[in-house]
Amino acid sequence: MPRTLNRRALLAAAASLPVLAGVAGCSGGSTAAGGTQQLVWSTFGVGTGTYNDLAAVANTLTQKTGRQIRLMTSDTGIGRLAPLINGTAQYSRTGDEYYYAFEGNDEYCSEQWGPQALRLVWTPPGNYGVLVRKDSGIETVADLKGRKFPKLIASTSINRKMEAILNYGGLTGKDVQMVDVTYSGQIEALKTGQIDTLYQNVVGANVSELASQYPIRWLDLGGGTPAQYATWKELAPMVKPGEFSKGAGLAKGETAVNMQYTIPVVARADRPHEEVASLVADMDRYYPDYKDTTPDAHRFGADQIQLTPLVIPFHDAMVEFLERKGRWSKDLQTRQDALLERERRMHEAWPAFWQDHKDQEDPKSARKEWVDWKKANLPELPETPGTLPGASSTTAPSGGHA
């Protein structure tokens, strides 16, 4: 059974979020085939690539199936997930918060949260990495030693990915000059010399504009030894190396390897099977109608669904869909079953754990002890081929973050 949050806290969080009825109007009451006609999906803010992709899908499904879908936006992970957990939203396209909420880690290790029973519904891939100006003299990650490196404000998950990138080059945070900057402020900071590198989606208006003004280079993260990827599993378990082309600053035919991961559509585990089955079937059926509407929407194709690293379970209706498409495997089922067992044991242990730790003055202490408890008491998850170490996966670029 999925855990429920403190109702007052969740309703307050949900009430503070804008619901954009203009994306797809609500005319209400009846149900479309396979589930609810009126749906709310939470996601990133208006103007982000993530929002634009989801709006394209929502509008297409409204026009083709009669589903009335509204998008609810938030700039924070908790703001995107709280409406999903309390039932205000039925689906959410999230950042890495889906993983941390499933595990009950970081800010989700709290009275209001704890581990959540979330499921993957659709997982389009995306590519992200660090870039530099070509006139910087920086050609590899190792060349970042002594340079000004961004420490993103209020972006713990991305900072962990950037630490993993440094580790790939044999560096740590002590080998660079850390500069506090917001995610959106990185491009201007690079232009003015406040930082020497930045972390970014490989496509998007902002990075394309930067590349048109200053020739840029994506630092390659491919072809490494297992040792170079040794910390990726702990720091960024949802990430693997992925080759991309057609990214900002790349010449025709040029490719590079950076981090590949999904900004997925997720639902609660108890979302009705028939509804999810109908939804994913329609996302596949009407893919030709929305695939060219944004620069990234083509990555929503069923043949491009990202399957690894698998860090939370797929919804059972999506597993059936992937089986029909010939994309499911014995290794994936083994991993899926292990994640379901991990979820069961976390949910079983959480109430007693929190009772013993809720009064600690420093919330970070409880967070660390929860991670330590899991390491000591839960079996290691089985690996799936094609994840780490060293094996790259090829994809065209996709969107994700703002």
Question: Model segments located where?
Answer:
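Pocket-lining segment of extracytoplasmic ligand-binding domains
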Residues: 96-98, 104-109, 136, 174-275
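Ligand-binding clefts/hinges and TM-proximal coupling segments of bilobed small-molecule sensing domains
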Residues: 148-164, 238-306, 310
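An extracytoplasmic/periplasmic, membrane-proximal ligand-sensing/linker region
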Residues: 202, 206-218, 274, 284-402
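Bacterial signal peptide processing site
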Residues: 27-29
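C-terminal motif of bacterial Sec signal peptides marking the signal peptidase cleavage site
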Residues: 23-25
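N-terminal secretory signal peptides and thylakoid transit peptides that target proteins
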Residues: 1-17, 21
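Ligand-binding cleft/hinge of the Venus flytrap
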Residues: 56-66, 159-175, 194, 210-214, ...
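Short, glycine-/small- and polar/acidic-enriched structural segments
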Residues: 34-168, 179, 218
